[in-house]
Amino acid sequence: VYAGKLHSEKSDEDHPAYSAAEKRNVSFTWLGAGEKIQAGECVMDILGPLTLDTEDENNNSLVLNVETPEGNFLLAGDMTQTEEEELLNAGVIPRATVLKVGHHGRDDATGKALVAAVRPQWAVISTSSQERPDTPAAQVTETLALFQVKTAVTQDAQVGILAELENQTATVWRVDWDGKHPLEK
């Protein structure tokens, strides 16, 4: 199990991920900005958070860039536009083939500056409007449309969304119980 070094819990032992891993006797590693994990040809770069946000725990969520020879995924975690701005100002946000939209597509994340810097072909929004009726926020979907980013929303699939990369191009599938179905190219 991996978790971000920066969190607002009283101690590392109070972090829910740490407690869960310890309870199940699973190895646990704290990660921070600048660290990398290699898995075959895949490299996962931890981009942020750069600083602890004591006001909004969402901004302490890990932000990851997963690089493959075929393209890359930027996984924005739950970061809001505050953290986006900090990472953009630090120059650590890369272009990405696929962007996993931050904070479940809420209106406090995935600003124009981030989308302009990343220039993704596809964005994936992990949300459920049954649980959060305000997601995905119109502001977020409008920003993605402004930059001509194709969008997949997890609640539109029975199982999930699958993104495959080949030659710096993403193919995205809606996965239902009867198999996978390609989304618009």
How should each PLM-predicted stretch be described?
Residues 1-185:
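Non-globular, low-confidence helical/coil segments that flank catalytic cores
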